[in-house]
């Protein structure tokens, strides 16, 4: 399925064969047996933990150059007894997809190691992520992310997404914490734990995973209970990320209603309301498939209760206010996203998934083809410095079988405390 000669956009706009992509990609990607992690890697420290397990920073040994992030999957645990009952569906998906995917804007897997019934995924190390970058620009004095940097980040993100979609892969969990950035300014789409092949699925995608995409980045068709969805769900998330890069805060910051004991998926009323407040009420005249959505009656109830029946889109007003508050020029220039930025944002945040812009179309949008040229290094021209990812020596034993089941926050950097650390609460 993942052809070795697939052509794709590179990060400066051309096409070239897939194999010529990135000579830095470690060779021998795949499963390695009877090899101990510490024989091949020096563990520098602990990065983060979640429901999946733990992530450590490491340096290669014996001629294996470079820095790596080692993801150790947690075995099932009951009390003090480790139960080796197999891997989660998320872990299996991530391993199988990352072993096949090969693109400069998708996280790069070096190898998979099995040691003492524990699975380790060894990735290239990335120093930053978009959540960390956004947080930095809110501290200590709020200052906007430079417009050329946003353009480069967004182009590289869409470039990687085009590759995934062309190879029939939906990411389904795009959010700032999952968009990684190397110290040289290369953007990588990370965390493919919810990714899914969508080429002629035997069952609807809904039947396998009823809840996908972190709530603030979840497309309206998912909120409306759609049983079948498309790559358009990822493009809506890109629109939300674009808006967040501009405003330094989530554009649709709703509260998630949790599933009940019967695992019934509730209507996300608060999140839908946050979208309606900016985008206006979706209408069947512009979204013909709306009336067939399982939660259509809930939407009507929300609109009547909140007085939103005649609410029109205020996205342009939000955009202009965002430009003004963050010091961007309202007209086209090197220092502003301009009207082209608004047009792209509005097409990414299109209610009807059939009308929503695709990754291919977005890459050809005037926002990218006019104005400031796109740089392969998103940090090019930026004189500031972003803090390094926090790596601690606490709990630094990668061999430890006792892995606490801490709540997965999606935060790859433990240094993001306070308000920013709460933003990705799921």
Curated annotation (Swiss-Prot):
Biological function: Component of the srb8-11 complex. The srb8-11 complex is a regulatory module of the Mediator complex which is itself involved in regulation of basal and activated RNA polymerase II-dependent transcription. The srb8-11 complex may be involved in the transcriptional repression of a subset of genes regulated by Mediator. It may inhibit the association of the Mediator complex with RNA polymerase II to form the holoenzyme complex. The srb8-11 complex phosphorylates the C-terminal domain (CTD) of the largest subunit of RNA polymerase II.
Lineage, top ranks: Eukaryota, Fungi, Dikarya, Ascomycota, Pezizomycotina
Pfam family membership, one: Pkinase
Keywords per UniProt: Activator, ATP-binding, Kinase, Magnesium, Metal-binding, Nucleotide-binding, Nucleus, Repressor, Serine/threonine-protein kinase, Transcription, Transcription regulation, Transferase
Domain Protein kinase per the UniProt entry, residue ranges: 41-368
Record-level Gene Ontology MF annotations: ATP binding; cyclin-dependent protein serine/threonine kinase activity; metal ion binding; protein serine kinase activity; RNA polymerase II CTD heptapeptide repeat kinase activity
Main location as per UniProt: nucleus
Region Disordered: start-end pairs: 390-426
Localisation per UniProt entry: Nucleus
SMART domains per record: S_TKc
Catalysed reactions listed for this entry: L-seryl-[protein] + ATP = O-phospho-L-seryl-[protein] + ADP + H(+); L-threonyl-[protein] + ATP = O-phospho-L-threonyl-[protein] + ADP + H(+); [DNA-directed RNA polymerase] + ATP = phospho-[DNA-directed RNA polymerase] + ADP + H(+)
Sites where the protein binds ATP: 47-55, 71
Protein name, UniProt field: Serine/threonine-protein kinase ssn3
Annotated organism of origin: Aspergillus clavatus (strain ATCC 1007 / CBS 513.65 / DSM 816 / NCTC 3887 / NRRL 1 / QM 1276 / 107)
One of the protein's GO biological processes: negative regulation of filamentous growth
Gene Ontology terms: cellular component: CKM complex; mediator complex
Complex formation: Component of the srb8-11 complex, a regulatory module of the Mediator complex.
Catalytic residue list: 173 (proton acceptor)
PANTHER family reported for this sequence: CELL DIVISION PROTEIN KINASE, CYCLIN-DEPENDENT KINASE 8-RELATED
Similarity comment: family membership: Belongs to the protein kinase superfamily. CMGC Ser/Thr protein kinase family. CDC2/CDKX subfamily.
Domain of life: Eukaryota
EC number: 2.7.11.22, 2.7.11.23
Cofactor(s), by name: Mg(2+)
EC main group: transferase
């Amino acid at each position: 399925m993942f052809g070795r000669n697939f052509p794709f956009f590179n990060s400066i706009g051309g096409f070239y064969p897939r194999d010529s992509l990135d000579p830095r990609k470690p060779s021998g990607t795949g499963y390695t047996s009877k090899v101990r992690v510490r024989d091949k890697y020096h563990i520098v420290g602990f990065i983060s933990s979640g429901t999946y397990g733990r992530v450590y920073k490491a340096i290669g040994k014996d001629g294996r150059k470079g820095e790596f992030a080692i993801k150790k999957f947690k075995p099932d645990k009951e009390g003090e007894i480790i139960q080796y009952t197999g891997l989660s569906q998320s872990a299996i998906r991530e391993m199988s997809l990352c072993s096949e995917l090969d693109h400069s804007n998708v996280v790069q897997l070096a190898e998979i190691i099995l040691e003492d019934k524990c699975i380790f995924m060894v990735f290239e190390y990335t120093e930053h992520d978009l959540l960390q970058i956004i947080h930095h620009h809110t501290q200590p004095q709020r200052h906007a992310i430079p417009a050329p940097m946003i353009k480069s980040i967004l182009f590289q993100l869409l470039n990687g997404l085009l590759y995934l979609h062309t190879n029939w892969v939906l990411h389904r969990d795009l959010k700032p914490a999952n968009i990684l950035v190397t110290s040289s300014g290369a953007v990588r789409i990370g965390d493919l734990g919810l990714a899914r092949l969508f080429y002629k699925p035997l069952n609807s995608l809904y039947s396998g995973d009823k809840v996908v995409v972190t709530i603030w980045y979840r497309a309206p068709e998912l909120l409306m209970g759609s049983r079948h969805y498309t790559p358009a769900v990822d493009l809506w998330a890109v629109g939300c990320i674009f808006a967040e890069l501009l405003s330094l805060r989530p554009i649709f910051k709703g509260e998630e209603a949790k599933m009940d004991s019967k695992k019934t998926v509730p209507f996300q009323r608060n999140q839908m309301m946050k979208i309606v407040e900016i985008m206006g009420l979706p209408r069947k005249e512009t979204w013909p498939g709306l009336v067939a959505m399982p939660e259509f009656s809930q939407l009507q109830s929300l609109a009547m209760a909140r007085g939103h029946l005649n609410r029109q889109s205020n996205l342009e007003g939000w955009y202009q206010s965002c430009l003004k508050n963050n010091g961007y020029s309202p007209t086209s220039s090197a220092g502003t996203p301009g009207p082209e930025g608004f047009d792209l944002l509005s097409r990414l945040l299109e209610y009807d998934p059939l009308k929503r812009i695709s990754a291919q179309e977005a890459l050809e949008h005037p926002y990218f083809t006019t104005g400031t040229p796109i740089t392969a290094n998103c940090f090019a021209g930026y004189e500031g410095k972003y803090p390094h990812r926090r790596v601690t020596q606490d709990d630094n034993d990668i061999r430890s079988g006792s892995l606490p089941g801490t709540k997965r926050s999606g935060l790859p950097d433990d240094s993001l405390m306070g308000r920013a650390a709460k933003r990705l609460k799921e």
